């Protein structure tokens, strides 16, 4: 690294691979993505804590979700049914019983480089932190192929060797709150186009929730979480901007570095053995 104009320039070893598009992800590539994300989450927390990066506890993640919910509620544009659904999820203690891990914090399909069905690199590390692992996985739910998130989550759990029982459900919750964040981005920037788009998506989400009462965000005791309601989000016809995480477009969220697929790309960090 070297000082450049009051900031730093960091040059990495060239990482070969093609940028990944969400609609082009196959179940095989999804499995490789799941394993790559698992490798990040298996890093020791000292990677983050030793350099003073953000560290969120499970209760902090819950409070962030509540803050987003409250801000969205204040707009008066979120259907009451969705607000109630999200409030119940926030109050469900089982949802927040997880161990925070190192996460990238800003993943989308475009974060990955691949050759064939193998991930070769991950781009953008400016949001590295300790937080909810579901945050790195929810974007996969935007795939039109149900086998994609299923393959990714299965490979992730297998690679981690730790089964986070409510991971899929928190990923669904995170995906739904992304629509709320898209709404907040529209109201904050006073963009009628974005706001109207978000409102339309919220009402479509409400319709889907009313049609399918078998997949609530809150769970009956001892019922295993599934990806069924996660994949149903695709039926909303979410625009590409939301599928690629609208929060990244919000001024309140720092933009992850997207330096391209050559010298500035970084391969996924290799965790030590044993992991964690």
Show which residues each predicted segment covers.
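Active-site acidic catalytic loop and adjacent metal/ATP-binding pocket
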Residues: 88-135
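Intrinsically disordered, compositionally biased tail regions
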Residues: 259-276
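Active-site Asp-x-Gly
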Residues: 115-167
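An alpha-helical support segment within catalytic cores of ATP-dependent transferases
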Residues: 45-104, 265
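Compositionally biased, intrinsically disordered low-complexity segments enriched
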Residues: 248-264
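ATP-binding pocket architecture of kinase catalytic cores
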Residues: 1-53
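Helix-rich C-terminal or lid/interface subdomains of diverse kinases
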Residues: 158-248
């Amino acid at each position: 690294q070297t000082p450049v104009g009051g900031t730093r320039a960091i040059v990495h070893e060239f990482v070969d691979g093609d940028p990944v598009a969400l609609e082009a992800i196959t179940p095989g590539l999804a499995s490789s993505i799941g394993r790559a994300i698992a490798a990040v989450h298996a890093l020791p927390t000292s990677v983050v804590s030793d350099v003073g990066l953000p560290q969120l506890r499970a209760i902090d993640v819950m409070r962030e979700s509540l803050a987003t919910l409250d801000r969205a509620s204040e707009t008066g544009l979120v259907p009451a049914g969705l607000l109630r659904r999200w409030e119940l999820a926030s109050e469900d203690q089982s949802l927040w019983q997880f161990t925070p891990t190192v996460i990238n914090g800003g993943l989308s399909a475009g974060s990955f480089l691949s050759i064939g069905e193998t991930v070769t690199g991950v781009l953008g590390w400016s949001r590295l932190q300790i937080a909810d692992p579901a945050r790195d996985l929810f974007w996969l739910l935007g795939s039109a192929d149900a086998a994609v998130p299923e393959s990714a989550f299965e490979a992730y759990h297998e690679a981690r060797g730790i089964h986070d029982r409510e991971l899929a459900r928190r990923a669904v919750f995170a995906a739904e709150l992304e629509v709320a964040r898209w709404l907040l981005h529209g109201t904050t920037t006073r963009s009628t186009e974005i706001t109207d788009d978000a409102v339309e998506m919220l009402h479509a989400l409400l319709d889907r929730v009313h049609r399918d009462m078998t997949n609530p965000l809150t769970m009956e005791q001892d019922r295993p979480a599934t990806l069924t309601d996660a994949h149903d989000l695709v039926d909303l016809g979410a625009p590409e901007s939301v599928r690629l995480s609208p929060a990244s477009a919000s001024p309140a969220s720092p933009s992850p570095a997207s330096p391209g697929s050559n010298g500035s790309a970084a391969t996924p960090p290799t965790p030590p053995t044993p992991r964690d």
